[in-house]
Amino acid sequence: MSGHSKWSTIKRKKGALDAKRNKIFTKLIREISIAAKMGGGDIESNSRLRLAVNKARVSNMPKDNIEKAIKKGSGDDNIGSEYFELTYEAYAPHGVALIIKCLTDNKNRTASEVRSVLSKSGGSLGAPGSVSYMFHKKGLISYSLDKYPEDEIIELALEAGAEDIYSEGSQIEVITSAENFEAISSFLRTKFEEDIAEIALIPGNKLSLNKEQMDKVLALIEKLEDFDDVQEVVHNLEIIDEIN
């Protein structure tokens, strides 16, 4: 019986992981299709599509799925014309700032759901500009130090004009201005294959909480991310794996 119980637990966990992965894939496919619809299916000339495809690859989306999403967006159907991009500024419990990016075909549904999730978890919507000033739009390029020597990445990144470089564990992050992101990422790509390359909102300062407070905020963020219309939740929470 114990073996059966263990196997059932494994299956449930696998099912939950598969469901989460499918939800991520659905959001990525939508973003790829919209990007292709708006700027064409050529990755080289469509920077938004290039970033969306890169995210999909990092998430291990099958190549066929990516290609189908590009074809769907760059075809003659009406995808994209009925979708809207929405950005909400909000507060989680304990003053954590949130920027919630959505892609939806129904503004009222999205607004209602986002507001409901926030209010049920102790958060609240903010006015436009209430938290966005806490974040800076930057280029973010991440590499695995298991693949490349740290000193080589640093040397080339500084030569390319990177603003900042951070390394932690087996990852190194190169920060650029939003304006120079494309040029710098292309320059570095001649020698290194990045794990992540995107325009990101980076908090000027991060907010530290105790474990109980942090878990409450992370639970809210997860609930928001579980909503299909939410593409991304940016926050200024300092996430610490273990708090004594």
Curated annotation (Swiss-Prot):
GO BP, one annotated term: regulation of DNA-templated transcription
Pfam family, one: TACO1_YebC_N
Chief localisation class: cytoplasm
Record-linked InterPro entries: Integrase-like_N (IPR017856), TACO1_YebC-like_2nd/3rd_dom (IPR048300), TACO1_YebC_N (IPR049083), Transcrip_reg_TACO1-like (IPR002876), Transcrip_reg_TACO1-like_dom3 (IPR026564), YebC-like (IPR029072)
GO molecular function ontology, one term from the record: DNA binding
Source species, domain of life: Bacteria
GO CC aspect terms: cytosol
Keyword entries, A-Z: Cytoplasm, DNA-binding, Transcription, Transcription regulation
Subcellular location: Cytoplasm
Xref: HAMAP family: Transcrip_reg_TACO1
Family indicated by similarity: Belongs to the TACO1 family.
NCBIfam families: PRK00110.1, PRK12378.1, YebC/PmpR family DNA-binding transcriptional regulator
Protein name: Probable transcriptional regulatory protein BT0025
Species whose genome carries this gene: Borrelia turicatae (strain 91E135)
